[in-house]
Amino acid sequence: MHTVSLTHQLVAIQDDFDLDKIIESGQCFRPQKLSDGRYRFLSGGALLYLTPLGDGQYDAAWYGSDWEYWADYFDLGRNYAALRCSLAGQSSYLDKSLDFGQGIRVLHQDPWEMLITFLISQRKSIPAIRTAVEHLARCCGEPLSAEGDEVFLFPTPQQLCGLSEAQLMGCGLGYRTRYIQNAAAQASSGTLDLGALTALPDDALFSRLLELDGVGKKVANCVCLFGYGRTAMAPIDVWIQRLIDEEFGGRDPFPSYGQQAGIVQQYLFYYKRSTSRSVAHKK
């Protein structure tokens, strides 16, 4: 266990920013609210703790990066309050979603982590995805200790290549094990250069991801949106398809939102999933 020192800095965030909603919005699976009130985020080789102090002030403590890295991660260069205002009035359901989801932001996450995470996500609930991803990190990710908190970084392609099929299956990956093995082998050998894909336009990036074993349209869209910041891409999963059928008469509304389609998808997804679960709990 490697003990690391954290850099602390007071930061101010005045735009929409709700850490609980971000964590529960279905786009990230390792961030966590700790018992001491801190929020922990991991991305690539970087670690961040945010402690809310009130009035948009936070104690930010990080390792393996700087605040600029995390400002980009949280998409702080985009005004989400203004974006919500610009989207309002197009449909009553969207208006409810925008109000309910105030504070959500689309995170700019590590492409490698997003590829593996969303390969794992297929036919799994959000709690099950979190469990599998955490098991994978604990199995071969680098362990760190920071101010009394022990964490495991997300495994590199090389670290994943070092695991046997039995070890991967033991992380709850099931039939997805083959997909993870193939992706790790390609990324480790250089056959798959996720960094180089950044230069591709949306359609070419999407097509390249579809060439990977186990990657369908939903997974490719998720990696494009959450790993590469392609906000015109809107993943359609079970929740979103149900919403399209029930609220939009079966018509896909996302093309009409242009470059904001992926952000709109997050508001709609969060509202649909949250309200459906609330109704289910009351029954």
Model-derived features with residue positions:
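HhH-family (HhH-GPD) DNA N-glycosylase catalytic core used in base-excision repair
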Residues: M1-K283
